[in-house]
Amino acid sequence: MVRPNAPDRFNEEKATYVVRGDGEGGDKPDLDRGAEVIRSVVRKLPARPGVYRMLDARGDVLYVGKARALRNRVTSYTQVARLPQRLQRMVAQTRAMEIVTTTSEAEALLLEAQLIKRYRPPYNVLLRDDKSFPFILLRTDHDFPRVQKHRGARRAKGRYYGPFASAGSVARTLNALQKTFLLRSCTDSFFANRSRPCLLYQIRRCSAPCVDRISKEDYAGLVSDAQDFLEGRSTAVQKRLGEAMTRAADAMDFEQAAVLRDRLKALTFIQGSQSVHADGLGDADVFALAAKGGQLCIAGFFIRGGQNWGHRSFFPAHVAGVPETEVMASFLMQFYEGVPPPKLILVDREPDESALLAEALGETAGRKVEISVPQRGNRKRLLDQAVRNAGEELDRRLAESSSQAKLGRELADLFDLENPPQRIEIYDNSHIQGTSALGAMVVAGPEGWMKGAYRKFNIKRAETQPGDDFAMMREVFQRRFARAIEEDPERTKGEWPDLVLIDGGKGQVSAVAAVFSELGIDDLPFVGVAKGPDRNAGRETFYLPDGREFTLPTNNAVLFYIQRLRDEAHRFAIGAHRAKRAKAMGSSPLDEVPGIGPARKKALLMHFGTTRAIKGASLEDLQKAPGVSAAVAQAVYDFYNPGG
């Protein structure tokens, strides 16, 4: 019998119930013990909709599920003989549960998707690629709206178009928008400080509203045409451009006719370049699933306004032993947790609880959402193409996995590892004469780059001398592995590496060896990888902590693989360094003035043009800037004129 070691808690406001075991039996999996923990929860559960979380002895979330009737659903986990092996393993690790009641099953489904995304439990199907999708933002908070790429929260005022499958899809569409509709893409501060047109005007990618080369009314017409194009009314736009070109030619205005011709060609090109055509489909997403060799791929097309905005393939994790209809349902809920659902979702198989899924997605969209398995017509042809894509992408993935597995075995042989490494961490430093210094860590596994695990380390300790690569490496490793020891001392979360590669030679290896000795880590393999004297790839020398060093033949497959790993670390480090340097260069003395935030800083810069002009302004001039109060003006004036 389980005796809770702390009082059971029930918070009526949050409708959350938690029960914990008494700690007997330790952390070792125990099926009977886990089932008893669940029974102790069931006795107090309501027959209401809600979400449940299975927790292990450390309090980590093992699984998140939803239920129409919590008592009935959770009871099923106590009948362990009927559970598949995957769920038996989960129950054996369960030492506590958390329950959240909801007002409806649809609400429970939405909450389940949020919690899966937050906790990423090991027994849930997981959408690996949860990076936010790019959108096109048409900003409307200016007299002359601008177009730009956007990711993340929708805080800016304007119209959002998307999702696009990739940054490349957005770039191509933005390029077409600039060529066809001549909309500006510059920042407001750049716009406000122009005295002559920029290069984009010269190459016919902008109408130069910054210097009054187009009226506000005519620019509004361009914006309206761009909106029509993005919302699928491109035929009407083509017709208007064609008619305008004809009128210009009839009026002998051949220069204007040529401009309109080029705009029409740009619009026609972007339409003709689409490999997937979805005439008459409006807004829809198309998903198809392929399974083979223990892996699974879901291919998706994104259609908006009848136009293909790209495709992407997904490889969900933790799918072994999970029915494909359940995988599809879980995928859709997680995918749309961060992306607005369209009116129509086409799938190659009906997901579990399809009607409930459509209801939940409809609640997030504020309108009806249809989930359909088409059997004929254009929709079926489009779905068949997605099915082919899913199969081809999965075959490619399996071939890469086979090659990757072979490389893993050879890597284990080369560095005398017990098993092929499941997690490889690669480290590099980046700085320019000690400025904007940082360390970077990239991670690779059997299935490729683990970009969600990448980390950058801003060098910030006073004792780390700028430009001292060895000291930088010491700081990076001290911070990385001191935290690992604190957060995962038993190494059970899969966040400890099986192999560490360091971009550097003897000095870097010695620095890392000293850190590991200080932290009491004596079982973690690490290797230094240094290029030859001329820095050419192919002449790398490998340095081991015991002092040995060796090279590999230039045509060795493992050498090529290690070069790719090191180059990815270098790419990530350089990119992070450039971003840090750009941020530092973008800082201003105004950042140090009390009461000056981004909005007032922007207002002052737009009004005066430069920080030098702000510094030389009188108190009266400062007070004339929009949005700047007398108190703020006084603070700015006092900052630049400390003696009065």
Curated annotation (Swiss-Prot):
Pfam (any one): UvrC_RNaseH
Domain UVR: 235-270
UniProt GO MF annotations: DNA binding; excinuclease ABC activity
InterPro entries per record: GIY-YIG_endonuc, GIY-YIG_endonuc_sf, GIY-YIG_UvrC_Cho, Hlx-hairpin-Hlx_DNA-bd_motif, RuvA_2-like, UVR_dom, UVR_dom_sf, UvrABC_protein_C
Primary subcellular site in the record, as a coarse category: cytoplasm
Biological process annotations from GO: nucleotide-excision repair; SOS response
Keywords from the UniProt entry: Cytoplasm, DNA damage, DNA excision, DNA repair, Excision nuclease, SOS response
A cellular-component GO term for this protein: cytoplasm
Subcellular location(s) per record: Cytoplasm
Transmembrane intervals: none
Domain GIY-YIG: from-to ranges: 47-125
Stated role: The UvrABC repair system catalyzes the recognition and processing of DNA lesions. UvrC both incises the 5' and 3' sides of the lesion. The N-terminal half is responsible for the 3' incision and the C-terminal half is responsible for the 5' incision.
HAMAP family the UniProt entry points to: UvrC
PANTHER family reported in the protein's UniProt record: UVRABC SYSTEM PROTEIN C (PTHR30562:SF1), UVRC/OXIDOREDUCTASE (PTHR30562)
Family according to the record: Belongs to the UvrC family.
Subunit: Interacts with UvrB in an incision complex.
Protein name per its UniProtKB record: UvrABC system protein C
Source organism per UniProt: Sphingopyxis alaskensis (strain DSM 13593 / LMG 18877 / RB2256) (Sphingomonas alaskensis)
Gene this chain is encoded by: uvrC
